[in-house]
From Swiss-Prot:
It is found in: Cellular thylakoid membrane. This is Photosystem I assembly protein Ycf4. It comes from Synechococcus sp. (strain ATCC 27144 / PCC 6301 / SAUG 1402/1) (Anacystis nidulans). The chain crosses the membrane at residues 26-46, 68-88. GO terms for cellular component: photosystem I; plasma membrane-derived thylakoid membrane. Belongs to the Ycf4 family. Its main location: membrane.
């Protein structure tokens, strides 16, 4: 994740948030696309008795049940890959956190799925922000996240979903944001 961009001249801080365009999502979309295409071509090869895969001999497979099952697995994988590529192209979950002293506003923006909630934008006055909270839970399913404590509302998550941030990066982002907003940093 890129580091936050703070400028003293404009009195603003902007933190980009990586959404579904993570390297792991690209890896899985490519792997499922290639695997699904291979399975579908193997199933079609066994049905048509024409070798559609140059590196193997799927025409030797009996269509029932092996060829049929491989074709169905291929179709399922291609549908899953299509969903992954769709989500990546929309950058679901991506966006930014922007804090501006001139306008006295904090803006949390994320991209969603198509529909009425495609653009999720939440704006708070800076005066309503009470603290920046760091949430760290270690163990089998670790959780490391930054939250804004906003007066009269619940905690607002600021970090991306997915792979937890390294502790040093989480601490430095939290400290920089708390210093910029002149609020306490809680949870460390």
């Amino acid at each position: 994740m890129p580091s936050p961009v703070a400028t003293v001249e404009t009195d603003s801080l902007q933190q980009p948030i990586l959404g579904s365009r993570r390297p792991s999502n690209y890896f899985w979309a490519i792997a499922v696309s290639v695997g699904g295409t291979g399975f579908l071509l193997a199933g079609l090869s066994s049905y048509l008795q024409v070798n559609l895969l140059p590196f193997s001999e799927p025409t030797r497979l009996a269509f029932l049940p092996q060829g049929l099952v491989m074709g169905l697995y291929g179709i399922a994988a291609i549908l899953l890959a299509s969903y992954l590529w769709f989500v990546i192209s929309l950058d679901v979950g991506g966006g930014y956190n922007a804090f501006d002293r001139k306008t006295q506003k904090a803006t949390i923006f994320r991209w969603g799925f198509p529909g009425k909630n495609r653009r999720v934008e939440i704006t708070y006055p800076l005066s309503d922000i009470q603290a920046v909270r760091v949430d760290i839970k270690e163990g089998l399913n670790p959780k490391r996240a930054l939250y804004l404590k906003v007066k009269g509302r619940g905690d607002v998550p600021l970090t991306r979903v997915g792979q937890p941030l390294p502790l040093t990066e989480l601490e430095s982002q939290g400290a920089e944001l708390a210093r910029f907003l002149a609020v306490p940093l809680e949870g460390l």
